[in-house]
């Protein structure tokens, strides 16, 4: 589902750079009339606009094992592939709901006395966030230990995405606090104080593999 019109427009703009050589469903997306708009979007059961579903999957997903004359693309999201081809960040070509993973941005209303505040919360996408069926999404879920193998902390490797979600000023403060936290972990490990090292359960599971 698109976040807003700007999200859909960005995706549409990126799709215009795709070629039949790299995109399995290039033909499916062609406009019905010359000069018309690419047919990459549709409405869901709630009337919200989203990327089209073709053959039980996203129109931008090149299926594994697909072969055709002239097709030189690879399995996976073709919007991600075009970002790599053109030297862009995938957050500039993919819909918000796709590039934000494994980060999760939610909005809450909190009451303090007689006042209400809108709060933006940046967290992780774990299985529980999906509700029913969440266990089926472990392939990109932070609850899966297979995802905890990066050489950098998420706040470093996902700097660009976090800056888009929360702004550069807020990110700078986040990075400062996380730097302090990471140094504390290193100091505690050097002093052999494991009880003072609090890490993500999936990270600990990954370290034991």
Spans of features found by a protein language model:
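Short loop/turn segments that flank or connect secondary-structure elements
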Residues: 1-209
């Amino acid at each position: 589902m698109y976040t807003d019109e700007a999200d859909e427009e960005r995706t549409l703009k990126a799709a215009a750079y795709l070629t039949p050589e790299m995109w399995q469903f290039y033909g499916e997306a062609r406009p019905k009339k010359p000069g018309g708009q690419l047919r990459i979007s549709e409405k869901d059961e709630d009337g919200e606009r989203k990327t089209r579903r073709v053959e039980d999957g996203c129109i931008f997903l090149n299926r594994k094992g697909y072969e055709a004359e002239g097709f030189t693309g690879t399995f996976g999201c073709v919007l991600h592939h075009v970002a790599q081809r053109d030297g862009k960040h995938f957050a500039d070509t993919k819909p918000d709901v796709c590039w934000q993973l494994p980060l999760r941005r939610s909005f809450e209303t909190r009451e303090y006395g007689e006042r209400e505040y809108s709060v933006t919360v940046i967290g992780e996408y774990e299985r529980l966030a999906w509700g029913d069926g969440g266990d089926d999404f472990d392939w990109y879920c932070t609850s899966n230990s297979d995802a905890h193998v990066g050489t950098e902390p998420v706040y470093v490797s996902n700097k660009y995405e976090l800056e888009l979600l929360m702004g550069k000023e807020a990110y700078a403060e986040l990075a400062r606090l996380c730097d302090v936290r990471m140094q504390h972990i290193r100091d505690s490990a050097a002093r052999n104080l494991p009880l003072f090292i609090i890490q993500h359960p999936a990270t600990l599971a990954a370290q034991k593999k």
